[in-house]
Amino acid sequence: GLNGDAFEIWAKHIPLRAVDKHRDNLFQIEAIFFGQAGILADKDGDEYYLKLKREYEYLAHKFSLTPMDVSHWRFLRLRPNNFPHIRIAQLACLYHRSYHLLSQLMEKNSLKEIRDVLRGGTSEYWVNHYTFGGSSISRPKTLSDSSLDLLVINTVVTFLYAYGIHKGDERLCARATAFLEELKPENNYIIRMWKQCGLNVAHAGDSQALIQLKKEYCDKK
C-alpha cells in the first residue's frame, strides 16, 4: 500500500518490551504508537492530542525513545478509513485487547474466528475522528472483511505456515493452506494481468502463487 514502507519503518521504532509493560493501558499504547510515528510533534492540538503528547514525552524519557520522521507518511489519494492515524489506532486497540495474540491465532480453526480476533476497533476518540483535530460523523473504525482477508493472507497464513515448518507441525501448515484456498483471490493489477492471459484464479492460494511468479520471473529480468 501507499504507506507500506512507512509502516515498516514505524514497526522498527516500536519498543515491544516497553509497550508490553503498558499493555493494559490503551491510552499509553496509543501515546507510544503515535509518538513513535512522529505524529505527536506539533505543539498545538485538541485536548486529546495534547494529553497523548504529554504522556508520550513522559514515556519517551522513561524508555529513551526516538520517533521516526513524520515525512514518511502519505495522505494523498487515501480514503479517510485508511489514514495512518486510523490504522495506528486500530493496531493499538488490537495490541491492547489481544494478549497472547499469536497463540490465539494458532488455536483458531475457522476464518470467522480469526477475523473476529483481528477485527479490533479503536478507542472512543477515533469513533468520530480520522485525524487529530476536526471531528467527523460518529462511525466505528473496524476493519472491513476485505481488509481482514488481506491481513490473513499476508500475515496470518504466512506466520502459521512458517511456524508449522519450524515446529514440524503439519497440521498448522495444512490449516494455513486451507485458509488460502478458502479465501477469495486478491484483486490487483497483477492478478488482472494474469486473468487477461486466460489463467483461472480460483482462490487466494492461486493469486499468491501468481504474484510470486511475477516477482521471481518478471520483475528480476
At which residue positions do the language-model features occur?
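Hydrophobic, aromatic-lined core segments that form the binding pocket/scaffold
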Residues: 1-209
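Cysteine-cluster motifs in flexible loop/terminal segments that predominantly coordinate metals
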Residues: 209-221
